[in-house]
Amino acid sequence: ENPDNWIGFCQKRRFWITKEMQENINQQNINEYLITEPSKDWSKYDSIICKPINVSGAKKIKIIKRGWKNLIKDPLILFSKKKQNILLHFDMHHGYGNLQKAINELDIDNQNDFKDYVSKNNTFNPHIMFIAKPAIINKWFEALFPWLERCEKKFRIDDLVNYDTGRMFAYLAERYLSYWFKKNTKYKEENWVQLDNF
């Protein structure tokens, strides 16, 4: 294994692309848009992660319906997009308190920093997609998998059954990726596309 090689990960129907414009990408022309070689400017970076998605701005009725426990603690969530952060989004979509339960399984330094990250940010880099060199990938996996193994002991697998929680460990890894790569690497955000018609 060459330590200077870039290794990339994508996901089903989600691809790295060279241009931000996505509306004309389809199954016939996708090869014209795919990132197939490292860009020259990547030499200045340790990692490539997806351009972020924003989780703030949910409809008020959805916040009331799915985030009512959060609203009891802080009613201003309804009126302030800054308070509509990653933690609220996770609580609404993947079970109230589940992200905090997982954060408690991190080492103390990362516990505090990751809690701060999900509480202060309303964007994250999605899909557990990244491109990096082997040394960075090894460090990432050494940080991620022991944490997820500890989380497996805290979550009852029988309770993780539907869309909200069935892929709990992937949802946790997805949020942690943004934090970890931004904290531990010099990163660049690249374009990506989700194509549902393949």
What are these regions (language model features)?
Residues 1-198:
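ER/Golgi luminal nucleotide-sugar-dependent glycosyltransferases, focusing on the catalytic module
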